[in-house]
Amino acid sequence: MQFDLSSHKGKSNRLYFTNDKDKQFETSIREMYKLAKEKPLGADYRFYLRRYLINHLKKPTLFDNYINKVVIITDGYLESEGKPADTKIYGFESQLHQAVSIGNILDVITSKGLNIPKVDIDLSNSEILICEVNERKTGKGFDFEILKTYWEDWFKRMNAKKIVFIQREQANDLTAKRVTEFVTK
């Protein structure tokens, strides 16, 4: 789902996010959850960034400065259908869980060469919100911090201006509120 705010030049972006847009967002989220339950395939975010997002990012000009806001709704695990996982946890649980306890997750990921491969895209004018991250039962207490490290490292290497990473909320209206806050700031 995409919201193009370029027509709101000089206006508060808050004017764009009306009750109708909130309802559209909530309806779209419900539909995505329904589709995910019916056929739980992982999204290929690397492909999306490389192929599609790059064409939708606004670049600053001499006259206008743009900040792109990208909202990613995911469980946090980068596991697209038919491809090896980009967020490699399984097989490395003992080292990664220990790294969570010690606080050196990125060091372990990097030393083992597990970093998510960088996409050739400049996100220096982009703020990223990754939301609805949900640990699996086997990773409770550890996977959130590991996934957060994977995603933050990945987006930092693509020069993202700001990265916000939030866990799954128990109510859709809380997620909608967090998204609205992110987009309007």
Where are these regions (language model features)?
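Extracytoplasmic, non-cytosolic globular domains
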Residues: 57-58, 71, 79, 85, ...
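Von Willebrand factor type A / integrin I
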Residues: 99-185
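Solvent-exposed loop/turn segments at secondary-structure junctions
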Residues: 76-79, 135-137
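A short acidic (Asp/Glu
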Residues: 3-5, 81-85, 139-143, 175
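Extracytoplasmic/secreted proteins, especially bacterial periplasmic and envelope-associated proteins
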Residues: 44-55, 72, 104, 146, ...
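Von Willebrand factor
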Residues: 1-66, 69-73, 78
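Scaffold/interface architecture of coatomer-like assemblies
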Residues: 1, 14-26, 80-82, 87-96
